[in-house]
Amino acid sequence: MSKPKVGINGFGRIGRLVLRAAVEKDTVDVVAVNDPFINIDYMVYMFKYDSTHGRFKGSVSAEGGKLIVTNGKTTHHISVHNSKDPAEIPWGVDGAEYVVESTGVFTTTDKASAHLKGGAKKVIISAPSADAPMFVMGVNNDMYDKANNHIISNASCTTNCLAPLAKVIHDKFGIIEGLMTTVHATTATQKTVDGPSGKLWRDGRGAGQNIIPASTGAAKAVGKVIPGLNGKLTGMANRVPTPDVSVVDLTCRLQKGATMDEIKAAVKEAANGPMKGILEYTEDQVVSTDFTGDTHSSIFDSLACISLNPNFVKLIAWYDNEYGYSNRVVDLISYIASR
């Protein structure tokens, strides 16, 4: 079977790392990139050098109006466009059937469907969506309906971390209710120094100077991908001055009491079985930078978890909110292409 042909709209943090993941995994063929604000020479530079993930381990160049990206094993010849209107991007001409919508702007079904006018067959939004169906690999991807799901969402990086863990715990022990906190790395929407920020004044404070309490819909979104948890989870974020890697703290009440050893055994079994590659299990004394570049959605930290009693537990899981998530975008494309 030929590799799915992919277009990327928006060459920001996620757009560039989806391309890196695509080259590394060699399961999809990226044939086009669109970004109205970045010309091709600047794309070469931004893809080659990355302050968080280091230099690209391969070569990238601009030749004849195309990005040529290779890691020695596979070469991607990528058409470059600079259109502001998604409907005007000629995905069909480039052969891009699957479009990654990673601008952060076109996150509704209506807005993202503009890509279909240019010849795309499916659109994968790399963010939560108000109305597009959300799929989390390892959790509910089997609910994908090829005939009807043309605009889909890969949910958020935090939902991708929380949902696999919540599924394992809920399936085995039953979650009555839970609160999630993500200690989350800085992202591009934050300010380097204090500045204006609409109604959410705290969000406008300097990212490098503060721990900033913030909202997140990640926990509630788990209820959309695991219907049995709908209305049982909510959460918040604390934004911290680190460039990448975040950590989820899920504090929940269990229906069926369990020792921490029983919980660890259940997670380890899933990590080595049905969720291999999605969920990871560690018994090492790790810190955040140990997971920069980790491709898993969720890494369960067995040493950091605690319980008050068999029915009330705090569970900890790490995630590279950039690269782990970008790998799932590529995996989701591979999955829907195989249906």
From Swiss-Prot:
User: What top-level class of enzyme does the UniProt entry assign?
Assistant: oxidoreductase
Per the record, the pathway is:
Carbohydrate degradation; glycolysis; pyruvate from D-glyceraldehyde 3-phosphate: step 1/5
- The active site lies at 157 (nucleophile)
Cellular component, GO, one term: cytosol
Q: Which residues bind NAD(+)?
A: 13-14, 35, 84, 321
Mind listing the GO biological process terms from this record?
glucose metabolic process; glycolytic process
**Superkingdom of source:** Eukaryota
Q: Which UniProt keywords apply?
A: Cytoplasm, Glycolysis, NAD, Oxidoreductase
User: Which positions does the site annotation Activates thiol group during catalysis cover?
Assistant: 184
Query: Which CDD domains does this one have?
Result: GAPDH_I_C, GAPDH_I_N
Where the protein is mainly located, per its record? cytoplasm
Q: Which region is the signal sequence?
A: none
The annotated subunit structure for this chain is: Homotetramer.
UniProt-recorded name of the protein: Glyceraldehyde-3-phosphate dehydrogenase
